[in-house]
Each structure stands twice: as C-alpha cells, then as structure tokens.
Amino acid sequence: MRAGDGLALRFPGLGPPTLVSADPAALRAFVAEHRVVVAAPVGGCVGSRVLRLDRHDPNLPHLADIVTAAGTRAAVLQPYLRETTAGTTRVHVVDGEPVAAVRHPPADAGPAVTCRVTDRDREICAGTAPALVAHGIHFAGLDLIGRYLVGIDATGASLGRPGAPLAPEVCAEIAGELLDGTFLSPVPAGACPAPAGTR
C-alpha cells in the first residue's frame, strides 16, 4: 500500500479490501476481520508512518490512536499481502495499454528486472484505462502486488529520477510502442494551430 494513492482507491474491484477512516474503533474492527493489516495516514509520503497492525497485539488500541492522530486524521488500511515478499510490479501504460513492466524486489533482495505483462496485469490495465484516459492521464505507472492494484503513478516521475531502475530500457520499450503508432491518440483538427506567420 502507498499512502496517498487516491487514484488506486477509485478501483475497489481491482485492489485488496480497503478501509479509509479516522475512527479508531473502525480500524480495530478491520484489523480483527483481516488479522494483519498495513496502515498509513492519508496524504503521507510513500513509506512514511506506515504501521503493521496485528489483531493479537495488546497495543492495538494505542496504535490505532497513533495512525489516526486520536481520531482526527483519516488512515488507509489494507490486509497485509503475503505476495509483498516477492516485490512489486510497475506496469507502464500508454492510453490504457500496457507497454512495459518492471519487477521491484524487496529491499536488499536484488536489482529490479524487466518482466512480462501477465493476463491479470492486462485485466487491471483494462479496468483502469477508461477513467485514466477520461481524466487526461495518457501515461501512467500501475503498481501491483500479486493480483492486486495498490498504487497509480500518474506523473511518470519514477522514470525521470537519476538512477531510476532500468529507466533507459523501459523508455526504449515505450518509445518503440509509440513509434509503432499503436497507442498514439489522434490529434483533433485545429488542436495544434500553425505558428504565427505561416498561414
């Protein structure tokens, strides 16, 4: 789970069970149902103030108060996914179509590697495509853990960071798909007016 990934929460059928609430009692009930969950305050930085909550932990009431700031701040809760131990997959999409994928193993478990797009990945891409394109998001990165969508990067910033894993390889794959013309959206007539003095 990535705190602040509000886009991913708009597709409940594609992600794990999720609770967004500032009510400590609701949080405790969610933990009781799912046994072990991951919790983070809404709007927090990725990976910051993330807590793992266990229904058998005697400190659970105190931790629920911490993550909600005593009921004054909403938190996002999702069941802990065992597939997390295998790492996350970032599927890069253009106009809703998957064009490249990178698997990021857990910390200290080896480098990121390119991987194939699975049928489940394509199902998730198809489920998010209409909404993303409708909101003008033509390039995005979908973050998956196992069979679940857990985050959406609508900025593409991950490929622009210095030292981003496999950025050249992924960009080359994306460029190849774009140059092939498969995912280029048609430009409406008049959308790109001629420069002054050329008419």
Which stretches of residues belong to each language-model region?
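Conserved N-proximal alpha/beta basic substrate-recognition cap immediately N-terminal to
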Residues: 1-20, 25-26
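ATP-dependent carboxylate activation and anion-phosphoryl transfer catalytic cores
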Residues: 116-199
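Glycine- and other small-residue-rich loops at beta-strand/loop junctions that grip anionic moieties
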Residues: 19, 80, 142
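Short, charged, surface-exposed secondary-structure boundary motifs
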Residues: 3-6, 27-30, 47-50, 152
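Phosphate-binding site of ATP-dependent enzymes
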Residues: 24-25, 32-38, 42-135
